[in-house]
Amino acid sequence: MTRLTLAPALLLVAGGAPAQPPASDSLYKRLGGYDAIAAVTDDFLGRLATDPSIGRFFVGHSTDSKQRIRQHVIDFLCSATGGPCIYKGRDLKTSHAGLGITKADWDRSVEHLVATLAKFKVPQKEKDDLLAAAGALEKDIVEK
């Protein structure tokens, strides 16, 4: 995955397990499936890229690179929430190493995630589940 702050958009990796049909009560299904996750990803990444305080992590990427990042995020979220996708990107610690992401950067990213989930009217339980899982990733993303 290109070095970029994907922060809380990325949830717990499924560890390369083979794709399985999503369980009917999986977070993937409860969020609305692939298309809903893709729409949330697009909005969230757009917010991050245009934010004056954290947009610096998106500078210098080609259109192709940005599309690959987008697809990695979608695949990660799909897989991590119990969907049928297989995430083939690097682990988050490796992907974010050397970027110097601070606690303030992390907190700002979480604010954008919350705003994105509100925009899409994600129900509270799903929002809570997603934010709790995202919180577990902070240790692999924040360096300072």
Describe the predicted segments one by one.
Residues 1-7:
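Bacterial N-terminal signal peptides that target proteins for export
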